[in-house]
Regions:
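Domain-length accessory/inserted modules outside core catalytic folds
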Residues: 2-131
């Protein structure tokens, strides 16, 4: 039985952001991200007091239509495209870790409804996401 992993899902296609607990298995990531190829990147989230998190993302998000930005930096530049799942940093064995309740609140405070030229009504997007 796989361990459970608590993270924040930013689903740009269904236009929602929410905490979600999943099994820490590859198929679970494919299912919640609605994709067939993932990548895991480390990004700092926040303004002055940035904190590092791992972000599981759709590695082929740019090839999907419509292309929807899921994360931007402090200047509004796109960082990630497609659905994303944000977790804690990896442990000493390289395994993803769950978010704390504080981390969930912190991340959700950085998710805002943002508009783009193609999507003028806006949808949830992670802001203040940087290298």
């Amino acid at each position: 039985m796989a361990k459970k992993l608590l993270g924040v899902l930013v689903d740009v296609y269904n236009e929602k952001a929410q905490p979600l607990e999943i099994e820490d298995e590859l198929d679970s990531f494919y299912k919640i991200l609605d994709c067939t190829c993932i990548d895991i990147v480390r990004r700092r989230i926040g303004g002055r007091f940035k904190k590092a998190f791992e972000i599981v993302c759709d590695d082929e998000g740019l090839f999907r239509e419509p292309q929807k930005i899921s994360a931007i930096d402090n200047l509004g530049q796109p960082q990630l495209v497609g659905n994303i799942f944000i977790t804690g940093t990896v442990d000493v064995d390289g395994n993803l870790t769950s978010l704390t309740k504080y981390d969930v609140s912190y991340i959700l405070s950085k998710v805002q409804k943002m508009s783009t030229r193609k999507f003028i009504n806006g949808y949830p997007m992670l802001t203040q996401c940087e290298y």
